[in-house]
Amino acid sequence: MNSVTPNPALVTQQAVQRLPRVLLLMFCAAYVLPGLFGRDPWRGADQSSFGYMLAIAEGRTPWSAPTIGGLPLETALLPHWLGAGAIALLSPLIDAPLAARVPFGLLLALVLVLTWYAAFQLARTEAAQPLPFAFGGEADTVDYARAMADGALLALIATLGLLQLGH
């Protein structure tokens, strides 16, 4: 058990100046979109996964236990199902490698949106609020929550690529 008493934050209204939404959205788009466009599956893992996705989408192997050349899939099925489903739905409109990446780009965008909203809701709670100043000037609840959510989103973007090649 932690015996140290909590040390609440002292945050001024000036410290939580609003980050322009357009700038934040452009930054998120610059993070998500390059992983979708202008590249082919050239790494070994990309080629292998794409091969299974394409075989599933074309009906050359069963969805429940996909194989290529008699070799069973050694990784999780869900990502391959998502890619195969996207290929089946989108391949008449776009090429198969791009179609296979679309659900993963959407999932990454969803993670970014949900992280921002979760941090925003958490920072709006009474327990998360900074201490009020004796003569005013403390951060407004919504402005403080927005600044914390922006920081959480930027921290996620900064560290996600370090954990795994996400795009």
What spans do the regions from the language model cover?
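Membrane-integral, polyisoprenol-dependent glycosyltransferases
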Residues: 2-167
